[in-house]
Amino acid sequence: MGSMDQSIAVKSPLTYAEALANTIMNTYTVEELPPANRWHYHQGVFLCGVLRLWEATGEKRYFEYAKAYADLLIDDNGNLLFRRDELDAIQAGLILFPLYEQTKDERYVKAAKRLRSLYGTLNRTSEGGFWHKDGYPYQMWLDGLYMGGPFALKYANLKQETELFDQVVLQESLMRKHTKDAKTGLFYHAWDEAKKMPWANEETGCSPEFWARSIGWYVMSLADMIEELPKKHPNRHVWKNTLQDMIKSICRYQDKETGLWYQIVDKGDRSDNWLESSGSCLYMYAIAKGINKGYLDRAYETTLLKAYQGLIQHKTETSEDGAFLVKDICVGTSAGFYDYYVSRERSTNDLHGAGAFILAMTELEPLFRSAGK
């Protein structure tokens, strides 16, 4: 089992995932999950993690918590209120697929259909790339691949809407075309086709920095989306290669001391840069899933083990009242310059990072178990 066989002074990854999920579920009712009473990707990412926990443990309370959130916002006819001008609104729809599979309640399919309709009305670049939001015209962000990609593929498989496969392939190819940096192999956070944003490079339109979480959303998307394509689809091979190349590039910038990654990935030598938890978790998820699915070489277990140990040692703690805490999670962030990113607020148990942490731990668990720990 490679490097995961090494003796590690931490518990099972699933133990930590449950500790964090239980802490947040004990802190917030589904009505209170921030931003309260909204169909939003913050809750969506966290609840995707909670549903993975349900699948891993069989504990029904995890399923019921996610279901209660959906039932709070979806009425008897499958109606729900969501922002109709942004990709972010779609991501929480990922929870609808396991809810429907388990309950066969058609409300969840109707709600998914409403979210799916958004693809037909979103504004696009000249090449057909979705604007991230109407508030950010002509811009594609790496985040958008996760916000809209996995849902589209799952919906395509549920309803046999094969055109959605081509849609996601196009979106990913455009992001890669416009944001990949040939020198580092990393992807810039955003691209402005109009080149009007203050941060936009006057030649390429790219934002100037490699933001950890945005790259994390991207590699997690790839790791999840490969298996959603038809088995003989040519882009399975393309996405595997892209994932392999991105992980290879990301791992060059892993902090040697902690095993984690910096808020601005390639500038760990700057004193005001800092090790960020959510991006580190998303990289761990993508690496673990890549190993589990055979997309990545098992040699990456060394990288994974170092990150796992560093995350638990440096970014988690248990409070006096028994709450499990994950620290140094960057709050919601737009595209910008270096100073903007490194000055962003650092949160504890923010749902971005909580969801990423739980997803990473559940994906790590099979490797941990196979090592006999």
Curated annotation (Swiss-Prot):
It is an enzyme of class 3 (hydrolase). Transmembrane segments: none annotated. Its EC number is 3.2.1.172. Substrate binds at residues 40-41, 88, 132-136, 213-217, 333-334. The keyword Transit peptide does not apply. Optimum pH is 4.0. Changing D143N: Loss of hydrolase activity. It comes from the Bacteria. One of its GO terms (biological process) is carbohydrate metabolic process. Optimum temperature is 50 degrees Celsius. It is stable below 50 degrees Celsius. Signal peptide: none annotated. The record marks Y41, D88 as: May be essential to modulate pKa of the D-143 carboxyl group. This is Unsaturated rhamnogalacturonyl hydrolase YteR. It comes from Bacillus subtilis (strain 168). The lineage of its organism: Bacteria, Bacillati, Bacillota, Bacilli, Bacillales.
